[in-house]
Design a protein with these regions (language model features):
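Bacterial N-terminal signal peptides that target proteins for export
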Residues: 2-10
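Bacterial N-terminal signal peptides
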Residues: 10-18
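Short, cationic, amphipathic peptide segments
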Residues: 26-28
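Glycan-processing catalytic domains of CAZymes
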Residues: 30-271
Length: 271
């Protein structure tokens, strides 16, 4: 069926909308709780703890805790902050976890293959910001409600994995930048989790980086743009001994830990 002839004004508006992505549509409506760039922007040299399992050990003399968004209560976050600590809240932004409170709001069409080694998680189709955007915004709002100073969005490198979707690097960049803008609109600090091949394109959007096992896989040089920009690089090794990586981590001005894979309370700091 042929379309009716559009007016010049309507045609102009229609064509303008054709060039606007869903990410562009969502971002202007992100609530800015606090105006200005007052969110936490750590420099290298921050002491920290990353604990996502077990009873939280709140007695460590560190500057920052990275804890689970869903499992950590607002009162626990308040306790840590009363001790002068920054609190980062972990959330997966690129995978579906079947045990989360909001697992049932993800439609099947955005659920891909299971993550290798993680039978409770499936990759998300991050090209569908129209679907995932509102879900992730609610998670960030929860972080604000609980008093988190920032978020650690995990699994934001689906394009380089066997996700079950034909994701492109550009789609990943669009999604990751959108996450950063959404976090900042809520006055939340945000870190780039892994995704090493896109560091150069994303370092200006993220406030810090968090990496797993770059010394084991000999790819830590890819994180140097963060340090060169005066931004902290946090990281962990699971298998290597501290004598293997700590001196190099310190010389690169990285803030590195030795941790158990379960990310319980045990830690050894290189600093």
């Amino acid at each position: 069926m042929r379309m009716k002839k559009m007016s010049a004004v309507y045609m102009g508006l229609f064509c303008m909308l054709c060039t606007v992505s869903m990410a562009d549509v969502l971002v202007p409506y992100l609530p800015a709780y606090i105006h200005g760039s007052s969110w936490w922007q750590p420099k290298p040299g921050v002491s920290w703890q990353w604990q996502l399992s077990g009873t939280l050990d709140t007695d460590l003399d560190v500057d920052m805790y990275d804890v689970d968004l869903f499992d950590t209560s607002a009162s626990m976050i308040s306790l840590l902050k009363s001790q002068g600590k920054k609190v980062i809240c972990y959330m997966s932004a690129g995978s579906w976890e079947n045990y989360r409170d909001d697992a049932n709001v993800f439609p099947e069409e955005v659920l891909g293959k299971y993550l290798d080694g993680w039978p409770d998680e499936r990759w998300l189709d991050i090209s569908r910001i129209d679907i995932l955007g509102p879900i992730m915004l609610r998670r960030m709002d929860l972080a604000v409600e609980k008093g988190c100073d920032g978020i650690e969005p995990d699994n934001i490198d689906g394009y380089s994995n066997d996700s079950g979707f034909a994701l492109t690097s550009e789609e990943q960049l669009t999604y990751n930048r959108w996450l950063a803008e959404a976090a900042h609109a809520r006055n939340l600090s945000i870190g780039l989790k892994n995704d090493l091949d896109q560091v150069q394109d994303l370092v200006s959007y993220f406030d810090w980086a968090l990496n797993e096992q770059c010394f084991q896989y000999d790819e830590c040089d890819l994180l140097l743009p963060f340090v060169q920009a005066g931004k902290a690089v946090f990281g962990v090794e699971y298998s290597l001994s501290t004598t293997t990586f700590c001196s190099q981590a310190n010389s690169m001005n990285f803030d590195w830990l030795k941790k158990n894979l379960s990310l319980d309370s045990w830690r050894v700091s290189c600093r």
